[in-house]
Protein backbone atom coordinates (compact mmCIF):
# COMPACT_ATOMS: atom_id res chain seq x y z
CA UNK A 1 0.00 0.00 0.00
CA UNK A 2 1.38 3.48 -0.87
CA UNK A 3 2.70 5.55 2.02
CA UNK A 4 1.34 9.07 2.45
CA UNK A 5 3.94 11.70 3.33
CA UNK A 6 2.52 14.69 5.19
CA UNK A 7 3.96 17.96 6.42
CA UNK A 8 2.98 20.11 9.38
CA UNK A 9 2.17 23.82 9.22
CA UNK A 10 0.55 26.60 11.22
CA UNK A 11 -2.72 28.46 10.80
CA UNK A 12 -1.25 31.94 11.09
CA UNK A 13 -3.12 34.46 8.91
CA UNK A 14 -1.86 34.41 5.30
CA UNK A 15 0.91 31.93 6.12
CA UNK A 16 -1.15 28.74 6.45
CA UNK A 17 -2.56 28.97 2.93
CA UNK A 18 0.88 29.67 1.45
CA UNK A 19 2.26 26.65 3.28
CA UNK A 20 -0.55 24.42 1.98
CA UNK A 21 -0.01 25.56 -1.60
CA UNK A 22 3.75 25.05 -1.28
CA UNK A 23 3.22 21.58 0.23
CA UNK A 24 0.99 20.54 -2.66
CA UNK A 25 3.46 21.90 -5.21
CA UNK A 26 6.32 20.04 -3.50
CA UNK A 27 4.47 16.73 -3.79
CA UNK A 28 3.33 16.08 -0.22
CA UNK A 29 0.19 13.98 0.18
CA UNK A 30 -1.17 15.89 3.16
CA UNK A 31 -0.93 19.14 5.09
CA UNK A 32 -1.79 19.33 8.79
CA UNK A 33 -2.31 22.53 10.78
CA UNK A 34 -1.61 22.82 14.50
CA UNK A 35 -4.49 23.70 16.84
CA UNK A 36 -3.15 25.84 19.66
CA UNK A 37 -5.29 28.95 20.00
CA UNK A 38 -2.82 31.03 22.01
CA UNK A 39 0.09 30.29 19.65
CA UNK A 40 -1.54 30.12 16.22
CA UNK A 41 -4.64 31.12 14.29
CA UNK A 42 -7.78 29.04 13.94
CA UNK A 43 -7.01 25.76 12.15
CA UNK A 44 -10.42 25.31 10.56
CA UNK A 45 -10.35 28.76 8.99
CA UNK A 46 -6.87 27.99 7.66
CA UNK A 47 -7.95 24.59 6.32
CA UNK A 48 -11.07 25.99 4.64
CA UNK A 49 -8.99 28.65 2.92
CA UNK A 50 -6.41 26.04 1.95
CA UNK A 51 -9.19 23.89 0.50
CA UNK A 52 -9.93 26.58 -2.08
CA UNK A 53 -6.27 27.25 -2.83
CA UNK A 54 -5.35 23.60 -3.48
CA UNK A 55 -6.72 20.75 -5.56
CA UNK A 56 -5.19 17.45 -4.46
CA UNK A 57 -3.55 17.57 -1.05
CA UNK A 58 -5.35 16.20 2.03
CA UNK A 59 -6.03 18.64 4.87
CA UNK A 60 -6.06 17.92 8.60
CA UNK A 61 -5.86 19.31 12.08
CA UNK A 62 -2.49 18.35 13.55
CA UNK A 63 -3.90 18.03 16.16
CA UNK A 64 -7.00 19.29 17.95
CA UNK A 65 -8.03 18.26 21.46
CA UNK A 66 -11.19 17.24 23.39
CA UNK A 67 -11.47 20.25 25.70
CA UNK A 68 -11.46 23.52 23.75
CA UNK A 69 -14.46 22.58 21.56
CA UNK A 70 -17.61 20.51 22.07
CA UNK A 71 -17.55 17.36 19.89
CA UNK A 72 -20.47 18.75 17.86
CA UNK A 73 -18.48 21.93 17.17
CA UNK A 74 -15.38 19.97 16.17
CA UNK A 75 -17.41 17.66 13.93
CA UNK A 76 -19.22 20.57 12.29
CA UNK A 77 -15.96 22.44 11.66
CA UNK A 78 -14.10 19.55 10.04
CA UNK A 79 -17.21 18.44 8.12
CA UNK A 80 -17.33 21.95 6.66
CA UNK A 81 -13.71 21.59 5.54
CA UNK A 82 -14.67 18.21 4.06
CA UNK A 83 -17.41 19.84 1.98
CA UNK A 84 -15.24 22.78 0.90
CA UNK A 85 -12.35 20.50 -0.08
CA UNK A 86 -14.47 17.91 -1.92
CA UNK A 87 -13.61 15.12 0.49
CA UNK A 88 -9.99 15.84 1.44
CA UNK A 89 -10.40 16.48 5.19
CA UNK A 90 -9.02 14.43 8.09
CA UNK A 91 -9.69 15.11 11.78
CA UNK A 92 -6.45 14.75 13.71
CA UNK A 93 -6.93 14.73 17.48
CA UNK A 94 -4.99 14.00 20.66
CA UNK A 95 -5.46 14.57 24.39
CA UNK A 96 -4.14 18.12 24.14
CA UNK A 97 -0.86 19.80 24.98
CA UNK A 98 0.09 23.44 24.35
CA UNK A 99 -3.51 24.47 23.63
CA UNK A 100 -4.46 23.33 27.12
CA UNK A 101 -1.24 24.45 28.83
CA UNK A 102 -2.01 28.03 27.81
CA UNK A 103 -5.38 27.68 29.56
CA UNK A 104 -3.76 26.31 32.70
CA UNK A 105 -4.86 22.74 31.99
CA UNK A 106 -3.20 19.34 31.64
CA UNK A 107 -4.12 16.88 28.86
CA UNK A 108 -7.61 15.37 29.06
CA UNK A 109 -7.91 12.12 31.07
CA UNK A 110 -7.99 9.03 28.87
CA UNK A 111 -11.55 8.07 29.88
CA UNK A 112 -12.84 11.54 28.98
CA UNK A 113 -10.89 11.43 25.73
CA UNK A 114 -12.49 8.11 24.79
CA UNK A 115 -15.99 9.45 25.52
CA UNK A 116 -15.20 12.43 23.32
CA UNK A 117 -14.05 10.17 20.48
CA UNK A 118 -17.27 8.17 20.71
CA UNK A 119 -19.46 11.28 20.50
CA UNK A 120 -17.30 12.85 17.80
CA UNK A 121 -17.64 9.78 15.60
CA UNK A 122 -21.41 9.78 16.09
CA UNK A 123 -21.67 13.39 14.95
CA UNK A 124 -19.41 12.76 11.95
CA UNK A 125 -21.56 9.80 10.89
CA UNK A 126 -24.67 11.96 11.13
CA UNK A 127 -25.97 9.87 14.04
CA UNK A 128 -27.91 11.13 17.04
CA UNK A 129 -26.30 11.83 20.40
CA UNK A 130 -28.50 11.85 23.51
CA UNK A 131 -29.04 15.37 24.81
CA UNK A 132 -27.96 14.27 28.27
CA UNK A 133 -24.64 13.05 26.86
CA UNK A 134 -24.18 16.10 24.65
CA UNK A 135 -24.89 18.48 27.52
CA UNK A 136 -22.57 16.64 29.88
CA UNK A 137 -19.61 17.82 27.79
CA UNK A 138 -20.36 21.40 28.83
CA UNK A 139 -20.30 20.88 32.57
CA UNK A 140 -22.87 22.35 34.97
CA UNK A 141 -24.76 24.69 32.64
CA UNK A 142 -28.54 24.70 33.32
CA UNK A 143 -30.48 22.11 31.29
CA UNK A 144 -32.74 23.06 28.41
CA UNK A 145 -35.82 21.95 30.40
CA UNK A 146 -35.44 24.98 32.66
CA UNK A 147 -36.68 27.16 29.78
CA UNK A 148 -40.05 25.29 29.60
CA UNK A 149 -40.23 25.56 25.81
CA UNK A 150 -43.24 24.26 23.87
CA UNK A 151 -40.93 22.13 21.73
CA UNK A 152 -37.33 21.05 22.11
CA UNK A 153 -34.81 18.98 20.13
CA UNK A 154 -35.14 15.27 20.87
CA UNK A 155 -31.46 14.60 20.34
CA UNK A 156 -28.24 16.25 19.18
CA UNK A 157 -26.97 15.76 15.63
CA UNK A 158 -25.57 17.66 12.63
CA UNK A 159 -28.82 18.26 10.77
CA UNK A 160 -27.05 20.07 7.95
CA UNK A 161 -24.71 17.17 7.16
CA UNK A 162 -25.57 15.68 3.78
CA UNK A 163 -25.94 11.91 3.59
CA UNK A 164 -23.97 11.94 0.33
CA UNK A 165 -20.90 13.52 1.94
CA UNK A 166 -18.15 11.03 2.69
CA UNK A 167 -17.47 10.70 6.41
CA UNK A 168 -14.39 12.51 7.72
CA UNK A 169 -11.87 9.96 9.04
CA UNK A 170 -10.58 10.41 12.58
CA UNK A 171 -6.83 10.07 13.12
CA UNK A 172 -5.65 9.92 16.75
CA UNK A 173 -2.17 11.06 17.76
CA UNK A 174 -1.12 8.57 20.43
CA UNK A 175 1.90 7.70 22.54
CA UNK A 176 0.91 5.69 25.62
CA UNK A 177 -0.85 2.30 25.71
CA UNK A 178 -4.17 3.60 27.07
CA UNK A 179 -4.58 6.25 24.39
CA UNK A 180 -3.42 3.83 21.70
CA UNK A 181 -6.06 1.35 22.88
CA UNK A 182 -8.82 3.97 22.94
CA UNK A 183 -7.85 5.08 19.44
CA UNK A 184 -7.82 1.48 18.24
CA UNK A 185 -11.42 1.09 19.38
CA UNK A 186 -12.79 4.33 17.91
CA UNK A 187 -10.63 5.81 15.14
CA UNK A 188 -10.00 5.07 11.49
CA UNK A 189 -6.30 5.69 11.99
CA UNK A 190 -3.67 6.03 14.71
CA UNK A 191 -0.56 8.12 14.12
CA UNK A 192 2.02 7.24 16.75
CA UNK A 193 4.11 9.93 18.45
CA UNK A 194 6.79 7.62 19.84
CA UNK A 195 9.73 8.70 17.68
CA UNK A 196 11.55 6.86 14.90
CA UNK A 197 12.98 4.03 17.02
CA UNK A 198 11.87 0.76 15.41
CA UNK A 199 11.52 -1.06 18.73
CA UNK A 200 9.14 1.56 20.11
CA UNK A 201 7.17 1.67 16.87
CA UNK A 202 6.76 -2.12 16.85
CA UNK A 203 5.52 -1.95 20.44
CA UNK A 204 2.97 0.74 19.52
CA UNK A 205 1.75 -1.26 16.52
CA UNK A 206 1.37 -4.42 18.61
CA UNK A 207 -0.48 -2.45 21.30
CA UNK A 208 -2.96 -1.09 18.77
CA UNK A 209 -3.62 -4.42 17.11
CA UNK A 210 -3.99 -6.21 20.45
CA UNK A 211 -6.55 -3.61 21.57
CA UNK A 212 -8.51 -4.10 18.34
CA UNK A 213 -8.52 -7.86 18.82
CA UNK A 214 -9.64 -7.53 22.45
CA UNK A 215 -12.53 -5.32 21.30
CA UNK A 216 -13.63 -7.87 18.70
CA UNK A 217 -12.38 -5.74 15.81
CA UNK A 218 -10.21 -6.68 12.86
CA UNK A 219 -6.65 -5.82 13.98
CA UNK A 220 -5.63 -5.01 10.41
CA UNK A 221 -8.63 -2.82 9.57
CA UNK A 222 -7.15 0.40 10.92
CA UNK A 223 -4.63 2.75 9.36
CA UNK A 224 -1.34 3.28 11.19
CA UNK A 225 1.19 6.06 10.87
CA UNK A 226 3.91 7.98 12.71
CA UNK A 227 5.03 11.50 13.48
CA UNK A 228 8.71 11.77 12.58
CA UNK A 229 11.23 14.52 13.25
CA UNK A 230 13.22 14.62 10.01
CA UNK A 231 15.91 17.07 8.91
CA UNK A 232 18.07 16.25 5.88
CA UNK A 233 21.55 17.75 6.18
CA UNK A 234 25.04 16.48 5.21
CA UNK A 235 26.12 16.94 8.84
CA UNK A 236 23.95 15.03 11.38
CA UNK A 237 25.00 17.40 14.17
CA UNK A 238 23.85 20.42 12.17
CA UNK A 239 20.61 18.56 11.46
CA UNK A 240 20.11 18.06 15.20
CA UNK A 241 20.78 21.73 15.85
CA UNK A 242 18.03 22.64 13.39
CA UNK A 243 15.60 20.01 14.69
CA UNK A 244 16.23 20.04 18.44
CA UNK A 245 13.18 22.11 19.40
CA UNK A 246 10.78 19.76 17.68
CA UNK A 247 12.67 16.66 18.83
CA UNK A 248 12.43 17.78 22.46
CA UNK A 249 8.73 18.57 22.04
CA UNK A 250 7.91 15.14 20.65
CA UNK A 251 10.23 13.38 23.09
CA UNK A 252 8.22 14.92 25.91
CA UNK A 253 5.11 13.09 24.71
CA UNK A 254 6.87 9.85 25.66
CA UNK A 255 7.23 11.03 29.24
CA UNK A 256 4.28 13.41 29.59
CA UNK A 257 3.51 12.51 33.21
CA UNK A 258 7.04 11.60 34.28
CA UNK A 259 6.97 7.90 33.37
CA UNK A 260 8.10 6.37 30.07
CA UNK A 261 5.58 3.96 28.52
CA UNK A 262 6.84 1.27 26.20
CA UNK A 263 10.35 -0.04 25.59
CA UNK A 264 13.32 2.22 26.31
CA UNK A 265 16.84 1.48 27.48
CA UNK A 266 18.46 3.17 30.47
CA UNK A 267 20.08 5.94 28.45
CA UNK A 268 16.87 6.71 26.56
CA UNK A 269 14.90 6.89 29.81
CA UNK A 270 17.49 9.23 31.28
CA UNK A 271 17.14 11.63 28.34
CA UNK A 272 13.35 11.48 28.35
CA UNK A 273 13.19 12.14 32.08
CA UNK A 274 15.62 15.02 31.64
CA UNK A 275 13.40 16.54 28.94
CA UNK A 276 10.37 16.15 31.21
CA UNK A 277 11.99 17.89 34.16
CA UNK A 278 13.54 20.68 32.07
CA UNK A 279 10.60 21.43 29.77
CA UNK A 280 9.70 25.12 29.50
CA UNK A 281 6.30 25.40 27.78
CA UNK A 282 6.95 29.10 27.17
CA UNK A 283 9.60 28.01 24.64
CA UNK A 284 7.63 25.13 23.14
CA UNK A 285 9.20 23.63 19.94
CA UNK A 286 12.11 26.11 20.02
CA UNK A 287 15.86 25.59 19.74
CA UNK A 288 18.28 26.70 22.42
CA UNK A 289 15.99 25.66 25.27
CA UNK A 290 16.63 23.78 28.54
CA UNK A 291 14.69 20.80 27.18
CA UNK A 292 16.72 20.73 23.96
CA UNK A 293 19.91 20.74 26.02
CA UNK A 294 18.85 17.38 27.48
CA UNK A 295 19.08 15.65 24.09
CA UNK A 296 22.16 13.52 23.44
CA UNK A 297 23.51 12.60 20.02
CA UNK A 298 22.78 8.91 20.62
CA UNK A 299 19.20 9.62 21.67
CA UNK A 300 18.57 11.94 18.73
CA UNK A 301 20.03 9.37 16.34
CA UNK A 302 17.37 6.82 17.35
CA UNK A 303 14.40 9.07 18.16
CA UNK A 304 14.70 11.32 15.10
CA UNK A 305 15.90 11.04 11.50
CA UNK A 306 18.79 13.44 11.05
CA UNK A 307 21.53 13.40 8.44
CA UNK A 308 22.22 13.05 4.70
CA UNK A 309 19.26 12.58 2.38
CA UNK A 310 20.14 8.96 1.54
CA UNK A 311 20.12 7.98 5.21
CA UNK A 312 16.79 9.77 5.74
CA UNK A 313 15.27 7.81 2.85
CA UNK A 314 16.60 4.53 4.23
CA UNK A 315 15.26 5.17 7.74
CA UNK A 316 11.85 6.25 6.52
CA UNK A 317 11.58 3.20 4.27
CA UNK A 318 12.42 0.94 7.23
CA UNK A 319 9.66 2.57 9.25
CA UNK A 320 7.11 2.30 6.46
CA UNK A 321 8.00 -1.39 6.09
CA UNK A 322 6.54 -1.98 9.56
CA UNK A 323 3.12 -1.55 7.99
CA UNK A 324 2.71 2.20 8.41
CA UNK A 325 0.91 4.01 5.61
CA UNK A 326 1.19 7.62 6.78
CA UNK A 327 4.28 9.54 7.89
CA UNK A 328 3.91 13.11 9.16
CA UNK A 329 7.22 14.95 8.88
CA UNK A 330 8.23 17.58 11.43
CA UNK A 331 11.14 19.54 10.02
CA UNK A 332 13.31 22.36 11.41
CA UNK A 333 12.30 24.00 14.69
CA UNK A 334 10.17 27.12 14.84
CA UNK A 335 13.05 29.50 15.56
CA UNK A 336 15.79 27.76 13.56
CA UNK A 337 17.94 29.93 11.27
CA UNK A 338 15.54 30.82 8.40
CA UNK A 339 18.10 30.29 5.64
CA UNK A 340 19.33 26.96 6.96
CA UNK A 341 15.77 25.80 7.66
CA UNK A 342 14.68 26.67 4.12
CA UNK A 343 17.67 24.80 2.68
CA UNK A 344 16.83 21.74 4.78
CA UNK A 345 13.21 21.81 3.64
CA UNK A 346 14.28 22.04 -0.01
CA UNK A 347 16.69 19.15 0.53
CA UNK A 348 13.84 17.04 1.85
CA UNK A 349 11.49 18.03 -0.96
CA UNK A 350 14.03 17.63 -3.77
CA UNK A 351 15.92 14.56 -2.54
CA UNK A 352 14.07 12.66 0.19
CA UNK A 353 10.48 12.96 -0.97
CA UNK A 354 11.14 11.65 -4.51
CA UNK A 355 13.27 8.87 -3.02
CA UNK A 356 10.28 7.59 -1.06
CA UNK A 357 8.05 7.19 -4.13
Q: Would you name each region that the model predicts?
A:
Residues 1-61, 168:
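N-terminal beta1-alpha1-beta2 module of alpha/beta enzyme domains
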Residues 44-64, 68, 123, 345-357:
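Alpha-helix-loop-beta-strand connector modules within alpha/beta enzyme cores
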Residues 27, 50, 81, 120, ...:
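Conserved, mostly hydrophobic/aromatic
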Residues 2-14, 64-71, 164-175, 230-233, ...:
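Active-site mouth loops of central-metabolism enzymes
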Residues 106, 110-160, 201-321:
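An alpha-helical appendage that flanks or caps ligand/catalytic pockets
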Residues 3-7, 31-33, 59-62, 89-93, ...:
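Hydrophobic faces of well-ordered beta-strands that scaffold small-molecule active sites
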Residues 12-23, 77, 174-182, 309-318:
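Short, acidic/polar
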Residues 30-53, 65, 196-198, 331-345:
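Glycine-rich, proline-tolerant flexible connector loops at the mouths of alpha/beta enzymes
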